[in-house]
Amino acid sequence: PVDMYVGGVEHAVLHLLYARFYTKFLYDIGVIDFVEPFKKLFNQGMICKDGAKMSKSKGNVVSPDELVRDYGCDSVRMYELFVGPPELDAEWNDRGMEGVYKFINRFYKLIMENKDKNYGKTAEMDKLKNKMIQEITERTDTFSFNTVISGFMENTNKITDLAKKQGGIDKDTLKTMTILIAPFAPHIGEELWAMIGKEGSIFEATWPEVDENALKETTMEIVVQINGKVKAKINVDVTLDKDSVISAAKEELGDRLPENIVKEIYVPGKIVNIVGK
């Protein structure tokens, strides 16, 4: 059987009907040993313009030529993925192209500005890198391509902010980011692959795997309350016991602590509530 069939719902009374009929007939006469022609079926939606399916007869077709000329084919490709869930119809809007175009330029600039810095790996950057691998991989596997693109934007912003804070990005993170974006912006991916000093095609590279250890939380945020009202938030080591967390919370409150403490409540990993008079 075919691993994946991608087609619009309009094929249900044509290709799919014929394919299933022939497959079941061949199975019945013992020629094949499977009864369905496709392991997985994905019906994509249609791109619409002015509320109607794009059609030459309706005169609402958008030619990609000018868009490719002005923004590049990677921007057009990524915007098509970003416009909405692939299984639903989506309304085309040329203005949305600008945001994707700006993102690709920011991404390119980020890699180029950091490729020669030889900055060492940090735990914080390693965590962001692995979070990005996890999100992009999971969303790609489930065909959630619109959230893949939004995920690139969100994670790139986080990595950019951290790079400014710590002074650079390590080479492995740059390599990983380039590999991740390549299926969605192949021309930029290939160019950046060469610019960071890699040989051959980026599409011969191995897809990165998540390091689960890098994703483990080392700190937790605790909400500190007095008589049920939020007064502060603290970040503490995840290994701290109840008494240590309460002690840290009381230290944070300082002179705001009640004179007479009646009770100290700790909800593990979430809240410290000091009850007093």
Q: What kind of region is each of these model predictions?
A:
Residues P1-P86:
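Alpha-helical recognition segments enriched in aromatics with Gly/Pro capping
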Residues L257-K277:
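Cysteine/selenocysteine-centered motifs that mediate thiol-based redox chemistry or coordinate metal-sulfur cofactors
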Residues F38-K40, N60, L215-E217, R256-P258:
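Short solvent-exposed loop/turn micro-motifs enriched in small/polar/acidic residues
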Residues I234, V238-L257:
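A short, contiguous, amphipathic alpha-helix enriched in charged residues
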Residues L17, F34, E66-N235, I265-K270:
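Helix-rich, typically C-terminal accessory recognition domains appended to large enzymatic cores
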